[in-house]
From Swiss-Prot:
Together with its co-chaperonin GroES, plays an essential role in assisting protein folding. The GroEL-GroES system forms a nano-cage that allows encapsulation of the non-native substrate proteins and provides a physical environment optimized to promote and accelerate protein folding. It comes from the Bacteria. This is Chaperonin GroEL. Gene3D superfamilies: GroEL, GroEL-like equatorial domain, TCP-1-like chaperonin intermediate domain. One of its GO terms (cellular component) is cytoplasm. Forms a cylinder of 14 subunits composed of two heptameric rings stacked back-to-back. Interacts with the co-chaperonin GroES. It catalyses: ATP + H2O + a folded polypeptide = ADP + phosphate + an unfolded polypeptide. One of its GO terms (biological process) is protein refolding. Keywords: ATP-binding, Chaperone, Cytoplasm, Isomerase, Nucleotide-binding. It is found in: Cytoplasm.
């Protein structure tokens, strides 16, 4: 397939046109007075959103060279979203500003490599300065404030802070669509896995069809139990305690299942059997998680353990277990807090090294189940369009809140970027590297300029006043007032701000040092069929 190639200034200018088209579309959404963008969908109603990364992903340009520029900025938004979960519009605005200023200087004869070196040095200095002024986030009220700023809704802020309080910072918080019009929070405390009872005769509540076990022992094994004799000694020991038993095994079949059911129906003792969750190596890991949580031991050949030799010491315990036809929930396992903390740290280290998105998701689920539970925010709205938009806002708010808890917060509304300009300006560089530093200094103003513009104010006037104000004092674009940003609750997670700047500088530097661009040549349009010819005649000879 033939290729089109452009060089030097021609190549860069083509890409920058794409950068500008995408950035101009996205940046109208920045700030409390940001506008919405309507996205056409192939099926269903259009999506109305102010989420930067969602808009960026939808943009596809006809010109191949311009499209490459747009896709690079879209990558900045996606990368920032992956790392910090928010700040995608800020990242896009910063990228455009660095590229635009950089291109002017490269066109005027500056060395792009020197400029890039200056951009990198200035970005590193700005990030260090941001981290130095970051304030930690703790407490339900502070968390609610961060979430409310990101979602533009105090109610959503309250839901997220309550969810994080209930399941912990490492807990899983999922966002689902509600069947009603109201948004609500539902929390499943304890460890839940998607396996239900093996027989409906094991239920303790025939109306709700659930089995509730109070203070049960828990047998955990990766073996199949077919012969009741394998576990008979253990059952006799449990029977003496008059406490219920939960069996988690690869399967329970053969004579074992009807024998257990018969004893349950007769009231000999309360027992429920469920299949082990997961498959393969993941099943082994999840069984070990359950064992750590409940203070038990996994009966497995990997450890040289046999069911017939198992003692009461191998059984786990919990305050309560609830089993329905689809799920099992273990509440307040009896495992030691030290063992659980060690297991959590092991999973966290695996999270840091994994490259698979699927593995990452499963590890996060395991981490949450060990850490405390799962919270579900069920989003309700009057229309499908409003529901989609609300769901995106809540996802952004949740990600921003997690980022804030992780690395702290700085003054919002672009104020923190203006406040670190003095540190960047003090960076001693010369030649083209100094030009790169100055490009970053100009770019640091751009988020404030755009927020002010979207709210109907003159950006340059706001920036001048901001530079002469005390650190932390900024412009509240929602009210038009000058306030202490953090005290007023106008805040940004430092992880979001620094990720936006780092990713913007990285991609902008690549665009400025581009000397050639290779794109696929458009295919010539197929010739139209001559008018009046009957398609059925073709090939009819």
């Amino acid at each position: 397939m033939a290729k089109d190639i452009k060089f030097s200034a021609d190549a860069r200018e083509s890409m920058v046109r794409g950068v500008d088209i995408l950035a101009d579309t996205v940046k109208v959404t920045l700030g409390p007075k940001g506008r919405n963008v309507v996205l056409e969908k192939a099926f269903g109603s259009p999506l109305i959103t102010n989420d930067g990364v969602t808009i960026a992903k939808e943009i596809e340009l006809e010109d191949h060279f311009e499209n490459m520029g747009a896709k690079l900025v879209s990558e900045v938004a996606s990368k920032t979203n992956d790392i910090a979960g928010d700040g995608t519009t800020t990242a896009t605005v910063l990228t455009q500003a660095i590229v635009r200023e950089g291109l002017k200087n490269v066109t005027a004869g500056a060395n792009p490599i020197g400029i890039r070196r200056g951009i990198e040095a200035a970005t590193t200095t700005a990030v260090e300065a941001l981290k130095a002024v970051a304030q930690p986030v703790s407490g339900k009220e502070a968390i609610a404030q961060v979430a409310a700023v990101s979602s533009r809704s105090e109610k959503v802020g309250d839901y997220i802070s309550e969810a994080m309080e209930r399941v912990g910072n490492d807990g899983v918080i999922t966002i689902e669509e509600s069947r009603g019009m109201e948004t609500e929070l539902e929390v499943v405390e304890g460890m839940q896995f998607d396996r239900g009872y093996l027989s409906q005769y094991m239920v303790t509540d025939n109306e709700k069809m659930v089995a509730d076990l109070e203070n049960p022992f828990i047998l955990i094994t990766d073996k199949k139990i077919s012969n009741i004799q394998d576990i008979l000694p253990l059952l006799e020991e449990v029977l003496k305690t008059s406490r219920p038993l939960l069996i988690i095994a690869d399967d329970v079949d053969g004579e074992a299942l009807p024998t257990l059911v018969l004893n349950k129906i007769r009231g000999t003792f309360n027992v429920v059997a469920v299949k082990a969750p997961g498959f393969g190596d993941r099943r082994k890991a999840m069984l070990e998680d359950i064992a750590v949580l409940t203070g038990g031991t996994v009966i497995t050949e990997d450890l040289g353990l046999e069911l017939k030799d198992a003692t009461m010491a191998a059984l786990g315990q919990a305050a309560k277990v609830t089993v329905d036809k689809d799920n099992t929930v273990i509440v307040e396992g009896a495992g030691s807090s030290e063992a659980i903390a060690n297991r959590v740290n092991l999973i966290k280290s695996q999270l840091e090294t994994t490259t698979s998105e699927f593995d990452r998701e499963k590890l996060q689920e395991r981490l949450a189940k060990l850490a405390g539970g799962v919270a579900v925010i069920k989003v309700g709205a009057a229309t499908e369009t409003e529901l989609k938009e609300m769901k995106l806002r809540i996802e952004d708010a949740l990600n921003a809140t997690r980022a804030a808890v992780e690395e702290g917060i700085v003054a919002g509304g672009g104020t923190a970027l203006i406040n670190v300009m003095d540190k960047v300006a003090a960076l001693e560089l010369d030649g083209d590297a100094a030009t790169g530093r100055n490009i970053v200094l100009r770019a640091l103003e751009e988020p404030v300029r755009q927020i002010a513009y979207n709210a109907g104010y003159e950006g340059s006037v706001i920036i001048d006043k901001l530079k002469n104000s005390a650190a932390g004092v900024g412009f509240n674009a929602a009210t038009g007032e000058w306030v202490d940003m953090i005290a007023t609750g106008i805040i940004d997670p430092v992880k979001v701000t620094r990720s936006a700047l780092q990713n913007a500088a990285s991609v902008a530097g690549l665009i400025l040092t581009t000397e050639a661009v290779v794109a696929t040549k458009p295919e010539p349009a197929a010739p139209a069929m001559p008018q009046g010819m009957d398609p059925g005649m073709m090939g009819g000879f």
